[in-house]
């Protein structure tokens, strides 16, 4: 799954998501099966956003949300289930954009905050919250400064978290801190050289 995500192989991600979705449909009371369907649809949505296919991103995110909601209703005590639901809400918000994003923006932050409350030591919980803050405007409780703090917290917990360095770079660039953004992208590429999107972000970020 990560290999296909890193390579932006949408055809493979579509196959994987479709297999796990079919399995989850047959095992409606299996929280883990629901989670895997949510996770694989989230990976597909992530790459669709990266290649600017908003239609597919929204469809995959909304499909995944259905499974994530089911996994949370079956086992509400598992932080990772809340994180993936929040991530999918954030992806749907990012795909829709504008005022339409508000429909999912609150769900993104509420669910990821629940994940952080349940497990405050998991770096990916802060990465997901940071992505939610990145897409939600400051006027609605998000914003790039909060996002930067979340990504820095994830890195403090795990300095080898490539995704945290990658998203820190994206947020720093949005804050017009290009030199720092480049350093973050360079670290992300060093930690995960297979990640196509990280290389693309580095290439398009000016030195100053």
Model regions: which residues?
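Helix-start (N-cap) detector for alpha-helical repeat units in TPR-like alpha-solenoids
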Residues: 31-32, 79-80, 123-124, 162-163, ...
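Residue-level recognition of tetratricopeptide repeat
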Residues: 5, 39, 46, 87, ...
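N-terminal leader/linker segments that initiate helical-solenoid repeat arrays
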Residues: 1-46, 51
